[in-house]
Amino acid sequence: MSIFTKIAEKYDLKIISEPVCLSGGLMHKMYKINTQQGTFALKLLNPFVVQRENAMDNYAKAERIELLLEQKGIPILPSLSLGGRKMQEIDGEYFYLFDYFPGKALKSNEITSDHCKEMGKVLAEIHSIDKKYENEAFYEMSVDWNFYLAEMKHTNTKLYAMLKDALPVIQDSQNKGNQARKKLPPIVSICHNDMDCKNVLWNGSDYRIIDLECLSYNNPFMELFELALCWSGYEDCKIDFQLFQAFLQGYKNAGGEMPIDWETLYDCNNGRLEWLEYNIKRVLGIDCGNDEKEIGIEQVKETIQHIIYYAKMKNPILEHCIM
């Protein structure tokens, strides 16, 4: 029996057409389900992610923050509570159900200054909900890149060559990031942690923020810097500084507290390294499903390009930061 049939039976839903796979999920699988009771989005959670240590605790914390954002009127697409729970489980498969929102993620060539100002504004609103002046839990990044390089040599020669060429930049980014994290101002607030273009669905000027499982308390300055880059073309290795500054201005105009030391934020912004490691593991078949190798290969290529581009763009980025 398929998971769709099991869900329909458990929640008394009558499915009226074949569920449609939705694009965009790089970690989990998303489907649109038409039923007589309405249209829903289903997020099937990656079993290897769910099995990680602390995963269930992190999901539970994110759900509590999601409720808080709902109460504050932030335009999110919250998961549905069924039987008093948000996360659902049938026969060991974990998932979330959502009301379907008829919107789409913007492509980079569709993003305007107005979109960036709006995203800066809503980010400032999220950060203002519960701000605490304390140090965030800091874990030093200690990825053994030489181990992965040696493993990749036997698995994929093309990726091995790319990784080898980029290794000095990757190791420099890891070391500088670890040093910079110690210099961050002691402040944490609610952060989405992945509010880039793929996780905001637009219908005209109306929008919903999705992918809320990563909600947690983190340094708001880091999230501001990272998202201003993501919304201004960093994903395509083509930053438009007009969009970059529009995002920062939107945040500032909405009362968001602005950073002073942008260079520290630049060095701290090395989360791409963790995404690179995750996808290298997919290519090597470590802690993942057999169907994840191809997406891993593409993501490793893309992420290495991002890391190299970011290193090249340091001076122009810092020149366009506003106080």
How would you name each of these model-derived features?
Residues 277-323:
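ATP/Mg2+ or Mg2+-diphosphate-binding catalytic cores
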Residues 13-35:
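ATP-binding glycine-rich phosphate-binding loop
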